[in-house]
Amino acid sequence: MNEQPYLSVVVPLYNEEGNVRDLHQKIVEALQKIGRPFEVIFVDDGSRDKTLEMCRGLSPLRLVAFRKNFGQMAAFDAGIKAATGEIIITLDGDPQNDPADIPLLLAKMDEGYDVVSGWRFKRKDPFMKRFFSRTANLLRGMLVKDGIHDSGCSLKAYKRECFKEIDLFGEMHRFMPALLALDGFRVS
C-alpha cells in the first residue's frame, strides 16, 4: 500500500488476544470492498495477555504499543495522531462493533456529514449495563438533541479536520459527536 490512505481505521486493544486476528481480517475484508486506499492502526493499550504478540505478522497493519494501560481514550488519541487518512474510523477491539458496518458510515458521510456514529443495536452486555446506557443516552439526547442513539458506541467515522478542533481526554469519545456538533460540524 503505497498510496496515501483515504481511510484510517483506529482500534484500541486491551487484552483482546482472542479477538484481534479475526477482527483484523473482518476490517480488511470490509475495507477492500470499498476500493479506496486504507490503513489499519491497532493501538495496544498495555495488554497483559498475548494481544501484542497476536498482532505481529498481520498485514496491512500499523501497530502502536503502550508499555502500560493508559485507557481507551489515550489509545484512540495515539491512533488518531498516527492516522494519515482523510476519514478516520474508530471502533472497539471487542466484537461489539461489526467492521462490515463501515460502508454504512461512509455512505452517510457521502450525504455531507462530518461525523457519523454507529449504534450497537444488538449489544452483548448484561441487562443492567444496557439499561443504564440507554437511560444515559436518552438523557444526553434530550439535552444535546444530536440524534445519536448510542453515544458509547465506538464505531464512528470522522473527517480528519474534526480532530483539529478538539483535544481528546478521559472518556470523551462518548461526547465527541455532541461537542463537534456544538462546533458546527454536521453529525449523524
Where are these regions (language model features)?
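Short aromatic/hydrophobic "clamp" motif used to bind/position activated sugar donors
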Residues: 88
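Short, well-formed alpha-helical segments that are part of the catalytic scaffolds
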Residues: 16-31
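Cell-envelope/extracellular polymer assembly enzymes that use nucleotide-activated donors
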Residues: 6-8, 39
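Catalytic metal- and UDP-sugar-binding loop of GT-A-like glycosyltransferases, i.e.
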Residues: 66, 91-93
